[in-house]
Amino acid sequence: MIVQVINGPNLGRLGRREPDVYGDTTHDQLAALIEAEAAALGLKAIVRQSDSEAELLDWIHGAADANQPVILNAGGLTHTSVALRDACAELSAPLIEVHISNVHAREEFRRHSYLSPVATGAIVGLGVQGYLLALRYLAGRPA
């Protein structure tokens, strides 16, 4: 099974941007961790990051068309993008929303997610391990 792992705005800056909040793992290191865990679980992970909402929408539309599960950390678009929510609602395979930090323990504006109502589940505040937990969940589910 192919799993789309999609990271949104500013996540390409992991390891440099607010390491006290997001840790010191870079996006390249995160991608390698995800790909290794996916392979160990018999999955193939396609890990992508973009600061462009349009590109994220294209990737989610592609996953919907291919009936592929998605692990999505939409970054700040989680709290602002109805368009991203609508694209995610089109998915028939599972959607797991992931956030590295505990968004519920941060600023008030981060506590609302447009994605959670259309997601299968959400993993927040467990650092980069959240992605690996999402993969383990998907490995136990048929797509």
UniProtKB/Swiss-Prot annotation:
<comment type="similarity">
    <text>Belongs to the type-II 3-dehydroquinase family.</text>
</comment>
<dbReference type="GO" id="GO:0009423">
    <property type="term" value="P:chorismate biosynthetic process"/>
</dbReference>
<feature type="binding site">
    <location>
        <position position="79"/>
    </location>
    <ligand>
        <name>substrate</name>
    </ligand>
</feature>
<feature type="binding site">
    <location>
        <position position="86"/>
    </location>
    <ligand>
        <name>substrate</name>
    </ligand>
</feature>
<feature type="active site" description="Proton acceptor">
    <location>
        <position position="22"/>
    </location>
</feature>
<keyword id="KW-0057">Aromatic amino acid biosynthesis</keyword>
<comment type="subunit">
    <text>Homododecamer.</text>
</comment>
<keyword id="KW-0028">Amino-acid biosynthesis</keyword>
<feature type="binding site">
    <location>
        <position position="110"/>
    </location>
    <ligand>
        <name>substrate</name>
    </ligand>
</feature>
<dbReference type="InterPro" id="IPR018509">
    <property type="entry name" value="DHquinase_II_CS"/>
</dbReference>
<feature type="active site" description="Proton donor">
    <location>
        <position position="99"/>
    </location>
</feature>
<comment type="pathway">
    <text>Metabolic intermediate biosynthesis; chorismate biosynthesis; chorismate from D-erythrose 4-phosphate and phosphoenolpyruvate: step 3/7.</text>
</comment>
<feature type="binding site">
    <location>
        <position position="73"/>
    </location>
    <ligand>
        <name>substrate</name>
    </ligand>
</feature>
<feature type="binding site">
    <location>
        <begin position="100"/>
        <end position="101"/>
    </location>
    <ligand>
        <name>substrate</name>
    </ligand>
</feature>
<feature type="site" description="Transition state stabilizer">
    <location>
        <position position="17"/>
    </location>
</feature>
<protein>
    <recommendedName>
        <fullName>3-dehydroquinate dehydratase</fullName>
        <ecNumber>4.2.1.10</ecNumber>
    </recommendedName>
</protein>
<dbReference type="GO" id="GO:0003855">
    <property type="term" value="F:3-dehydroquinate dehydratase activity"/>
</dbReference>
<dbReference type="Pfam" id="PF01220">
    <property type="entry name" value="DHquinase_II"/>
</dbReference>
<dbReference type="GO" id="GO:0019631">
    <property type="term" value="P:quinate catabolic process"/>
</dbReference>
<dbReference type="InterPro" id="IPR001874">
    <property type="entry name" value="DHquinase_II"/>
</dbReference>
<dbReference type="GO" id="GO:0008652">
    <property type="term" value="P:amino acid biosynthetic process"/>
</dbReference>
<comment type="function">
    <text>Catalyzes a trans-dehydration via an enolate intermediate.</text>
</comment>
<keyword id="KW-0456">Lyase</keyword>
<dbReference type="InterPro" id="IPR036441">
    <property type="entry name" value="DHquinase_II_sf"/>
</dbReference>
<dbReference type="GO" id="GO:0009073">
    <property type="term" value="P:aromatic amino acid family biosynthetic process"/>
</dbReference>
